[in-house]
A protein has these predicted regions:
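Extracellular, repeat-based ectodomains that mediate carbohydrate processing or recognition
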Residues: 1-343
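Acidic, glycine-rich low-complexity segments
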Residues: 340-356
């Protein structure tokens, strides 16, 4: 999937995977980007992010930095040729004008056995950034799981601020993956991930087949809130594909896919085969209300959620779904600062839609 982030000048940058890189002077697959101004017009030329052009580059993620620049991370499938593993996570910083700042760098620098991928990146209040990723050789790395989630914190200049560390401290059996990271207004960050060993108990009972877990960190990488299960009510079926975003009030919101929606009722009736659910948290990491279903249409499949915070303190959740009278569309639901639905769902089409 492509990744998009807003820029400080009101524009935005889009990053994507190009499967035809060999025709563009690059790899089999490359990572490309394009900046746009505040009116949506192209700003500058399309550019290739990856310097290393052997093998395939995929799974891009982008975050805007406080100085006006941005950082891109991605999966490199030819890591053994680039100083790393079979698969590695690499990164590249850019300044506010879109010019590469320094050389491409290896994010997963210590964990070099097995594969490292599924990167997620977020900018931090102090000017640096944090990257989280999936490590497929967790059993060899700090006595972790089959798969683990790791993270590393960088300063604004790309130097290391906090050495890479395992995010899932307690949940070490089974596999932990699909990480998503977001910055918090106090300078810290939160990581959420998929745990496929739902028998893990957080003190309120065992979970699902797959569960969504989270953990909150201070800016220096120390623990602020111990890991916790996000889906506290829905234990049957599987909960995964998490997305997290920090909120203006210092808290955060997590959205995820629920594969047992037909058995999960939010008071308005049972849901779809797959549903999108969410839950808000306060700055102290405590849940701010119950988990809620984002999709109003409760037939067929709703999945692939993405959540983003808004300047008014609210947030918006978007997802891929099958609605009433259409085959496949992108839906969105906006929420106010209290978590109440603030407007009707938006349905995108294959045309040049505009919202006014």
């Amino acid at each position: 999937y492509p990744s998009v982030a807003p820029l400080g000048d009101g524009g935005f940058v889009v990053i994507w995977r190009d499967d035809y890189g060999s025709q563009h002077g690059g790899s089999g697959w490359d990572i490309f980007g394009q900046r746009y101004d505040s009116s949506g017009k192209v700003s500058g030329d399309e550019f290739r992010v990856n310097t290393e052009t052997s093998g395939n580059q995929s799974e891009p993620a982008v975050a805007v930095l406080s100085g006006g620049g941005f950082v891109v991370t991605w999966r490199d499938d030819h890591g053994t040729q680039h100083g790393g593993n079979g698969y590695d996570v690499r990164g590249q910083r850019y300044d506010a004008s879109g010019v590469a700042a320094g050389a491409e760098f290896l994010v997963s620098q210590v964990q070099k056995s097995g594969n490292q991928y599924e990167p997620s990146v977020a900018s931090l209040k102090a000017g640096g950034f944090v990257v989280a990723w999936r490590d497929d050789s967790g059993g060899s790395h700090d006595s972790g799981s089959g798969y683990d989630v790791w993270a590393r914190v960088f300063n604004a200049d790309g130097t290391q601020a906090v050495a890479e560390f395992r995010v899932n401290k307690d949940q070490k059996s089974g596999n932990q993956y699909q990480p998503t990271v977001a910055s918090l207004s106090n300078g810290g960050f939160v990581v959420a991930w998929r745990n496929d060993q739902g028998s893990h108990n957080d003190g309120t009972g065992a979970g699902s087949g797959y569960d969504v877990w989270g953990r909150v960190f201070n800016a220096d990488g120390t623990q602020a809130v111990a890991e916790f299960r996000v889906n506290q009510v829905h234990f049957s079926g599987s909960q995964y594909e998490p997305s997290v975003s920090g909120l203006k009030n210092g808290g955060f919101v997590v959205a995820w896919r629920d594969d047992q929606g037909s058995s999960h009722n939010d008071g308005s009736g049972n849901g779809s085969s797959y549903d999108v659910w969410g839950r808000m948290y306060g700055a102290n990491g405590a849940a701010a209300g119950d988990e809620f279903r984002a999709n109003t249409y409760i037939s067929t499949y709703q999945y692939g959620p993405s959540v983003g915070s808004l300047d008014d303190g609210g947030f918006v959740i978007s997802w891929h779904g099958y609605g009433q009278g259409d085959s496949s569309s992108i839906y969105a639901q906006r929420y106010d600062v209290q978590g109440n639905k603030a407007m009707v769902q938006l349905v995108g089409t294959g045309l040049a839609d505009e919202v006014t």
